From Swiss-Prot:
SUPFAM superfamilies linked: N-terminal nucleophile aminohydrolases (Ntn hydrolases) (SSF56235)
Pfam family, one: Proteasome
Protein name as annotated: Probable proteasome subunit beta type-2
Enzyme class: hydrolase
Cross-referenced Gene3D superfamilies: Glutamine Phosphoribosylpyrophosphate, subunit 1, domain 1 (3.60.20.10)
Coiled-coil parts of chain: none
Keywords, alphabetical: Cytoplasm, Hydrolase, Nucleus, Protease, Proteasome, Threonine protease
Propeptide: 1-6
Function: The proteasome degrades poly-ubiquitinated proteins in the cytoplasm and in the nucleus. It is essential for the regulated turnover of proteins and for the removal of misfolded proteins. The proteasome is a multicatalytic proteinase complex that is characterized by its ability to cleave peptides with Arg, Phe, Tyr, Leu, and Glu adjacent to the leaving group at neutral or slightly basic pH. It has an ATP-dependent proteolytic activity.
Record's subunit section: The 26S proteasome consists of a 20S proteasome core and two 19S regulatory subunits. The 20S proteasome core is composed of 28 subunits that are arranged in four stacked rings, resulting in a barrel-shaped structure. The two end rings are each formed by seven alpha subunits, and the two central rings are each formed by seven beta subunits. The catalytic chamber with the active sites is on the inside of the barrel.
Species of the source: Encephalitozoon cuniculi (strain GB-M1)
Length: 227
């Protein structure tokens, strides 16, 4: 059975960079196949992407585009732009007319500034201040639209996590933990399992007093025959 990431992935710009966040659940039909998979992929030193849809398709497209950008960098001795990654992915996906189940959120920083794009499986793309894709994107985008504003790094991380959490709590195919990636001019910071969702807050074991169940009557049955 095909493994799908189900997924709630989020991307947003903040004052000095870009935040990407994703849940960590992948499914095979109604079964959770992996509770802690990685949906955030590194493309170059300052370009990252999140993948939703079919797990194999999303990771293969990201790896293919990463190879293209690294070949460009080695050939021309120039750092590739985020728009270069966007172009490689959209042209590749458009050739297959939506047959490749990969929806991507791309974030990065280059010589032209901070960039955030959403790329759909049929090859269309859009630039945005914030975006969410995947089966849990409805809850996530509602959180982003109601609370997004000019923010610093810590505020942006909290909002991105809350958006993914909203997707997780309203989507059976999203769950487990939240991974966060911060991209700014100093580099990339990947925060693995930054927040756990759905874990019981009360971890104390229940202890019952010995006299909590009182014996009101005692009766002995002789069921062994004596010879």
């Amino acid at each position: 059975m095909i493994t799908k990431t189900g997924t709630t992935i989020v991307g947003m710009k903040y004052k000095t960079g870009v935040i990407l966040a994703a849940d960590t659940r992948s499914t095979q039909g109604p079964v959770v196949s992996d509770k802690n998979c990685v949906k955030i992929h590194q493309i170059t030193d300052k370009i990252m992407c999140c993948g939703a849809g079919t797990a194999a398709d999303a990771s293969r497209v990201a790896r293919m585009a990463s190879r293209e950008l690294r070949l460009f960098q080695n050939k021309y001795l120039r750092l590739p732009l985020v728009s270069h990654f966007r172009k490689v992915c959209t042209q590749h996906l458009h050739k297959y007319g939506g047959g490749i189940g990969a929806a991507l959120i791309v974030g990065g920083i280059d010589s032209e500034g901070c960039h955030l794009y959403e790329i759909h499986p049929h090859g269309s793309e859009n630039s945005a201040l914030f975006v969410s894709l995947g089966s849990g994107s409805l809850g996530a985008i509602a959180t982003l639209e109601s609370r997004y504003r000019a923010m610093d790094k810590d505020e942006a991380i909290d909002l991105a996590c809350d958006a993914v959490k909203a997707g997780i709590l309203n989507d059976l195919y999203s769950g487990s933990n939240i991974d966060v990636c911060v991209i700014d001019y100093s580099g990339v910071e990947f925060l693995r399992n930054y927040r756990r969702i759905g874990v019981s807050e009360n971890t104390d074991t229940l202890v019952y007093p010995l006299d909590s169940v009182r014996i009101k009557r005692e009766e002995v049955f002789d069921i062994v025959e004596e010879y």
